[in-house]
Amino acid sequence: MNSILERIAKHKLEEVAVAKKNKPLHVLSKQQPGEIRDFITALKSNTSPAVIAEIKKASPSKGLIRKDFNVAEIAKIYTQNGARCLSVLTDIEFFQGHPDYLALAKSKTTLPVLRKDFIIDSYQIYESLVLGADCILLIVALLDDVQLMDFCQLAQELKMSVLVESHTQDELERALRLPTPLIGINNRSLHNFKTDIQLSIQLKQFVPKDKIIITESGINTREDIKLMQSHDINAFLIGESLMRADNIGKALQKLMTD
């Protein structure tokens, strides 16, 4: 891990320690979760691009991305304009997100919702369930193989889906050992934040056909989507290009249709 990812992981450990004091696991685990929606099936259905549309205010590499940031409104717009699923940044320190944003977005959509955060402790998985997450993100670069398997199995026992994210061939091989069909390839390095969408095309050859590849980061245009589809990659996690748009709904439609 490099300095950026180390900083995030270090802060996340502190954040989780505070959360555990404020609401111990035995209290959290007694809270009743709401309806869990099928994230995997939502990405499989029909042949148009399967877009996971992301609600993201800021990032460490780009700073503030969207000033006019209304989570409820954005969730509604994504839902009305063809997104298959939503992704919500819940990290406070580095992405100006908030756990409450997930619950709010879930209440304003019929779509399945991914919690986009840096999971380093099983506590966060129970927390994700209570917040309304239908799917969690596990980042291979943050976790060892035992953690990856334990966290994946725990989330699935709680009926959530798991998207496992990799950036290198080595990370991808580790991701493929997990019992989940959702394989995220992040075109942006979490070490230096450089982006190259060719990475998804290069790594696709190592992914079995029964998996669903989700290409993440750097997908900004209709041409980017067509390029990926020409290589049989049909699921996309898209945030920044939509968040920067004056008209989010039109921007999403433009990505999906000629």
Curated annotation (Swiss-Prot):
It catalyses: 1-(2-carboxyphenylamino)-1-deoxy-D-ribulose 5-phosphate + H(+) = (1S,2R)-1-C-(indol-3-yl)glycerol 3-phosphate + CO2 + H2O. It is an enzyme of class 4 (lyase). Coiled coil: none annotated. It comes from the Bacteria. CDD domains: IGPS. Keywords: Amino-acid biosynthesis, Aromatic amino acid biosynthesis, Decarboxylase, Lyase, Tryptophan biosynthesis. Its EC number is 4.1.1.48. SUPFAM superfamilies: Ribulose-phoshate binding barrel (SSF51366). Disulfide bonds: none annotated. InterPro entries: Aldolase_TIM, Indole-3-glycerol_P_synth, Indole-3-glycerol_P_synth_dom, Indole-3-GlycerolPSynthase_CS, RibuloseP-bd_barrel. GO terms for biological process: L-tryptophan biosynthetic process. GO terms for molecular function: indole-3-glycerol-phosphate synthase activity; phosphoribosylanthranilate isomerase activity. Pathway: Amino-acid biosynthesis; L-tryptophan biosynthesis; L-tryptophan from chorismate: step 4/5. PROSITE patterns: IGPS (PS00614). Belongs to the TrpC family. NCBIfam families: PRK00278.1-6, PRK00278.2-4. HAMAP family: IGPS_B. This is Indole-3-glycerol phosphate synthase. The gene is trpC.
